[in-house]
Amino acid sequence: MKVRIKWLENVAFVGESESGHAMVMDGAPEGGGRNLGPRPMETVLIGTGGCTAYDVVHILRKGRAPVTDCVVEIAAERAPQDPQVFPRIHFHFIVTGRGLKREQVERAIHLSAEKYCSASIMLGKTAAITHDFEVREAGYEIRDTRYEIR
């Protein structure tokens, strides 16, 4: 896998992927940026969220679970001093479907976290990662239950 990062101006860069996609990254105005895109460390979390969401949906579909939506909300803490790594990251999954079982969702999240999601497994080498999830019935906007994975 290869990517190319090109400086645009000030603290703005464009990242180009081998698959032909581009993404602008920029800093906050107080850091010399113009807020043209996410910060580079935000893209780490976005990529990790995409990786694990992909896995969870794929695993549920492969098991013929009636999943209709999957959202991952990630909260990460930055270290106060350089390098400002993520010492703690929390993944909150909101998985929606018709008659989804808690056990199906928990298993899919566990497999992603422990076996398939390269990004979260790499981050887990330096950060304490926790997960929890909600299962929602399709057609309802009510939070059903929040489950913690142990």
Specify the residue positions occupied by each region the protein language model found.
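Extended beta-strand/beta-hairpin segments
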Residues: M1-I46, V57-R150
